[in-house]
Amino acid sequence: MGLPEDVAKRAAWYRSELERHSYAYYVLDAPTIPDTEYDKLFRELQELEQQYPELLTADSPTHRVGGVPLKEFPPRQHGVPMLSLNNAFAPEEVEAFDKRIRDGLETIAAVDYAVEPKFDGLAISLTYENGVFTCGATRGDGVTGEEVTPNLRTLRCIPLRLRGEGWPALIEIRGEVLMFKADFAELNARQRERGDKEFANPRNAAAGSLRQLDSKITAGRPLSFFAYGVGAGADALAVKTHGEMMGLLAAWGFPVAEERRVVQGVRGLLGYFVEIGVKRPGLPYDIDGVVYKVNRLDWQAQLGFVSRAPRFAIAHKFPAEEALTEVLGIDVQVGRTGAITPVARLKPVFVGGVTVTNATLHNEDEVRRKDVRLGDTVIVRRAGDVIPEVVAIVPEKRPMRDLFGSEPLNPPFELPATCPECGSAVVKGDDEAIARCTGGLYCPAQRKQALWHFAARRAMDIEGLGDKLVDQLVDAGLVHSPADLYGLTVETLAGLERMGEKSAQNLVAAIDKSRQTTLARFIFGLGIRNVGEATARDLAKHFGGLDALLAADSAALQMVPDVGPVVAESLAAFFAEAHNREVIDGLRRAGVSWPEGEPAQAGPQLLAGKTLVLTGTLPTLKRDEAKALVEAAGGKVAGSVSKKTDYVVAGEEAGSKLEKAQELGVPVIDEAELMKLLAKGVE
């Protein structure tokens, strides 16, 4: 039975509409329909393609959600090599470049140059055949890259079919994949919320996101693309200048830099460099310089190439964003999780587009390694949105006690023994670089984080008490510790922003409901470092009551399964702090209670001694439910994959954990196979 003609027309219409709206949203930044309408069109096309698989085409927008994970990236040879550019760092080098160009062209007249920002991302090449995107690859060594086509299809700003007309049968589009600063900040915020490792900078985030074997992970990352040239197929274009070529790329549907233009002579080059340098801090993406290219394409061909770089182009790199200044003092700051960070107070200095008065020293070990002291002259670096840091001292400028320079005037930095915010003890593990305040529940610097964690669903489960409301309560001085939550009234809450009487009543009811909890939830809610849900359950089961736990010494704590010296030290330090004991007593006085002395009855331990890792979205089970089932059967659920992992349970959109399992040869099972293990055990 053939494909109904009306169905084929409908699918073509859906594809055309979706690409039109995507182009308006992601390239023109001018949305034409609400997201809900776009999603509706997308789902209808998906349903058609599922019903009629023969409808699926290479340019279908449904490819943008990602597909089956790859085992590796195949190599891909570029039709025309992707050469690197020579660099210039000083005006004299730019003047020398311009002279070489004029000498090569045998002209004394000023040359027209196409100029544009140098994106700080990952260079890629996109191949289009008859206007349809068929292949994409990274730069690699310039001759051969890695094919990452499925991942590039997920970038909504890359056209799957070229717009307009005038493109040859085969053409390679060159450009850069990057991540906007705002998107990078949001991605790292999500990484923090999930407890995953944060990315160091937008470039690393873009590169890591593009080189995922599972394209569904790439689809979930906020990547962007800018086109800046053409490889194979350039000879077939009816354009005479690079500027005209960029206009053609924009007409075909590619994002191109708005800051590009054509300037004349070396004076125009240097003027553009200064202009972009001033604009740089306000640009939505990172750049590390500007690119100059001879504008006329016939002159580019005449000048040719030298070694592995074109003669007709050069990258003018920005200087390192560093400056010298004096250390006026070394303070310590307390983070939301109790981390103690030394910070250098500096004589104000202009660097990286802003006036810097403070710079991080990271931790005590770093201060000692760099030997930063009061009065030192130091090198301060700032790049983009990165927090300014002290790179090194200038030894010859250090203040000395005498003219002979035999002894420094100021002593080495010493970390304070107590927290400057609350006076609680500061501790640092033997194998840890970061020192921490032990006043978790009491410390003002940690107050918001402690309250948010205490109210979380897996802890005391106070529905409606989110981070924004916690901010209001703390900022208004209404709540200083978790115990204060139980004194809040409807009248007090109703006066807060976006909190009506009904919402206030619901929150007071949720707080009241949380008074009856379990010991495991209470322990987890205290936010003790290194004590997660599983450890909290083990502690509750082992000790049966809070008083027994409070009285336990390090040796007794290490009798609990999976509690070693590090966890025991965290528990002992937390409970030894008088302020934390006061908060616990306050919670008990507020009526927070739980059944004591009734450890849970263990069921059949069919997974005893087995370690499982959960990744992705399971068909019917929530992750919490799957974890509880595994632990009830005696198994352990770990957060990362290692050689000691027995099984990885993978659902939809499984990420890097699935890749790690495949790499290590760890068995991968689905939800159905997990249920069999829970019912019958390991055969």
UniProtKB/Swiss-Prot annotation:
Presence of keyword Cell membrane: no
Role this protein plays: DNA ligase that catalyzes the formation of phosphodiester linkages between 5'-phosphoryl and 3'-hydroxyl groups in double-stranded DNA using NAD as a coenzyme and as the energy source for the reaction. It is essential for DNA replication and repair of damaged DNA.
BP-aspect Gene Ontology terms: DNA repair; DNA replication
Annotated EC: 6.5.1.2
GO molecular function: DNA binding; DNA ligase (NAD+) activity; metal ion binding
SUPFAM superfamilies, alphabetized: BRCT domain (SSF52113), DNA ligase/mRNA capping enzyme, catalytic domain (SSF56091), Nucleic acid-binding proteins (SSF50249), RuvA domain 2-like (SSF47781)
Record carries keyword Mitochondrion: no
Residues given in the record as NAD(+) binding sites: D35, T36, E37, Y38, D39, S84, L85, E116, R139, E176, K293, K317
Pfam families given in the database record: BRCT, DNA_ligase_aden, DNA_ligase_OB, DNA_ligase_ZBD, HHH_2, HHH_5, Nlig-Ia
Active site: K118
Designated name of the protein: DNA ligase
UniProt domain BRCT: residue ranges: 602-683
Keywords assigned by UniProt, alphabetized: DNA damage, DNA repair, DNA replication, Ligase, Magnesium, Manganese, Metal-binding, NAD, Zinc
Gene that this polypeptide is encoded by: ligA
Family: Belongs to the NAD-dependent DNA ligase family. LigA subfamily.
Catalytic reaction equation(s): NAD(+) + (deoxyribonucleotide)n-3'-hydroxyl + 5'-phospho-(deoxyribonucleotide)m = (deoxyribonucleotide)n+m + AMP + beta-nicotinamide D-nucleotide
Binding residues annotated for Zn(2+), in chain numbering: C419, C422, C437, C443
PANTHER family the record matches: CHROMOSOME TRANSMISSION FIDELITY FACTOR 18 (PTHR23389), REPLICATION FACTOR C SUBUNIT 1 (PTHR23389:SF6)
UniProt cofactor(s): Mg(2+); Mn(2+)
